[in-house]
Amino acid sequence: MPIWVDADACPIPVKEILYRAAHRAQVVTTLVANQGLRVPPSPFIKTQQVEKGFDVADHVIAQQVKPGDLVITGDIPLASWVIDAGGEALNPRGEIYTRETIKARLGMRNFMEELRSAGVQTGGPAPLNAADKQRFANALDKWLIRGKLS
């Protein structure tokens, strides 16, 4: 039950939560990015640097994820691929994507992309706040506990 992290866009506070959880729960956590990453020394924390390019890290994660794995990503298409592969996807704000919710999220993402391509200013997500970090940590802990019980 490893954890994969779409690390290029993952906020630093979320990575720090993941580092502590990987060490505490002794779960292999692999951060995939198209740039070098500094991570704390740990046998449970690994990095995988991929070529620069659009969605390269996403494709690498999607190819390696197995049923039961957890992927940390805010990328909706990657989350959909993960769910289709039998994995679980959690975004940095603590929302778990499910088969029931991912299609609606994909539809909204595509709609917003169409608006942006038509020149409509849609804004971006709000900055990560303390409640988001707490929600993420709680969702991660629930996943880790479920994994230990199975």
Swiss-Prot record:
Q: Which Pfam families match?
A: DUF188
Q: Which InterPro entries match?
A: UPF0178
Q: Which top-level group of life is the source organism from?
A: Bacteria
Entry's PANTHER family? UPF0178 PROTEIN YAII (PTHR35146:SF1)
In the record, the note on similarity to other proteins reads: Belongs to the UPF0178 family.
Q: Which HAMAP family match?
A: UPF0178
Protein name as annotated: UPF0178 protein AHA_0543
Q: Which organism is it from?
A: Aeromonas hydrophila subsp. hydrophila (strain ATCC 7966 / DSM 30187 / BCRC 13018 / CCUG 14551 / JCM 1027 / KCTC 2358 / NCIMB 9240 / NCTC 8049)
